[in-house]
Amino acid sequence: MKYIFYSFLSLIILASCKTNKDYLSRSDNDNTLFDAIKTLKKHNTDTTALQALPVLYNLAQQRNLRKINSYSSSRELSRWDKMINAYSTLQEMYNAIVENDAASRVVTPVNYQQTMYDLKHEAAADYYTAATVFLNKPGRADAKQF
């Protein structure tokens, strides 16, 4: 009986460790946005999620767009992958908001699908150019480098 009591007590303590912070006081905007949308899927009239969603979307969008701008000023080839990942996050936010009626009433998200498509084509052209430069160099070591 004693062991059951202690295991039940430890279970209650662990369950109470979940964060009770409101949405706007959290530091990770992307995950917080998805948490708010998940809450709206369960309870579409949750006022805290409905009020926080426009602010969270704007913060996450601005943060990702700033990352994209900083990556685009770089000249390294890996910038394409970083930019595509940031646009993918923005597109996931768009998809999550559009799929939820309560969220789409509060926020009008931007669709980045065409931008991602164009960016992937630019990346492919840049990778192709870099690969042909390596292949045109004499010697096998340079061709294997890429």
Where would I find each of the regions flagged by the language model?
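Sec-dependent signal peptide recognition
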Residues: 2-7
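Bacterial Sec signal peptide processing site at the extreme N-terminus
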Residues: 11-35
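Generic N-terminal amphipathic/basic segments
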Residues: 23-24, 35-39, 48-56
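Residue-level recognition of tetratricopeptide repeat
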Residues: 29, 43-46
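Leucine-/aliphatic-rich long alpha-helical segments
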Residues: 36-40, 68-71
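Post-signal peptide N-terminal segment of secreted/secretory-pathway proteins
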Residues: 46-145
